[in-house]
């Protein structure tokens, strides 16, 4: 279940603090939903930058459905979850959406973060570093616009 806390044109910030975490994080699905939102309600901006706060450890209790490559399906965790999330990042990029990530996860997930987000990532160790890291990512995107 996804809930839009604030639309692009919404000036009211009251709902923004109604976010809460609960359970699993199927990152690929969340990225796909973000792409759908930007495609069907793009707002006034001609370009979009999506900054994701992540632990780079996508997992879910629901399995990935069977496919020709995996007739029995597989668990949404580890390599399968990372591959799905990375595929969704690439799909957003093909749509023209810039995707960057602030990674706040375990050392063991750093490789997954790099696989998913590539160079468009900043690592933080605490929430007090979030604003600075997001600012650096935004500056990098602005620099690339000038190239």
Model-identified regions with their sequence ranges:
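Acidic, glycine-rich A-domain
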Residues: 1-147
